[in-house]
């Protein structure tokens, strides 16, 4: 559950799996990844070097580790239902399917949201993470991460990339 180790390890595994699939003859015509998976996709598509990807992922993990607060919950509902119920301080971190999303953010505000979810018959489960990733709580580290990213060489993709960001 410690992001400082988990993120680099996830990247290494995802990149290695992608390289193995390519070695077996799988020829992707488009790449997609979520969170750390986007770094693996960028690397496999030739947009960034493995060395730069490791630097980005490791620095990202260190910055996010320093925040170390907040909660994440998997919520069984549609975005259109959740958005009006979502208080300030929480974010939709991921839309995994039409009726399964992840809500992330401030721990105290999350408790209020969970009460609202209970009142509306919405089921949920806590994700065991060390912080509220993909939420507004990560905003304080954006400037520092941008400084790291400015040092990286980005190349045109050799394989198309589908971003999971909106």
What are the language-model segments listed below?
Residues 1-88, 96, 120-132, 136, ...:
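FabD-like malonyl-/acyl-CoA
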Residues 83, 132-166:
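Conserved, helical-rich catalytic subdomain that frames metal- and/or nucleotide-binding sites
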Residues 79, 105-110:
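Helix N-cap motif at beta-to-alpha junctions
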Residues 91-93, 151:
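A generic local secondary-structure boundary/capping motif
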Residues 47-51, 109, 141-145:
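Short, hinge-like loop/turn segments at secondary-structure boundaries
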Residues 99-104:
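A generic structural motif
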Residues 82, 92, 110-113:
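Hydrophobic, small-residue-rich alpha-helical packing segments that form membrane-like cores
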Residues 110-122:
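Charge-rich, low-aromatic oligomerization/scaffolding segments with amphipathic character
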């Amino acid at each position: 559950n410690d992001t400082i180790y988990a993120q680099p390890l996830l990247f290494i595994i995802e990149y290695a799996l992608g390289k193995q699939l390519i070695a077996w003859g799988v020829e992707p015509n488009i790449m997609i990844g979520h969170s750390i998976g986007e770094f693996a996709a960028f690397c496999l598509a030739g947009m960034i070097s493995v060395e730069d990807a490791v630097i980005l992922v490791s620095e990202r993990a260190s910055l996010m580790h320093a925040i170390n607060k907040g909660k994440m919950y998997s919520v069984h509902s549609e975005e259109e239902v959740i958005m009006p119920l979502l208080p300030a301080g929480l974010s939709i971190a991921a839309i995994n399917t039409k009726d399964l999303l992840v809500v992330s953010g401030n721990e105290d505000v999350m408790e209020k949201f969970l009460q609202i979810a209970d009142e509306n018959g919405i089921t949920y489960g806590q994700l065991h993470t060390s912080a509220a990733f993909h939420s507004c709580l990560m905003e304080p580290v954006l400037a520092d991460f941008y400084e790291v990213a400015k040092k990286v060489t980005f190349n045109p993709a050799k394989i198309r990339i589908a971003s999971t960001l909106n």
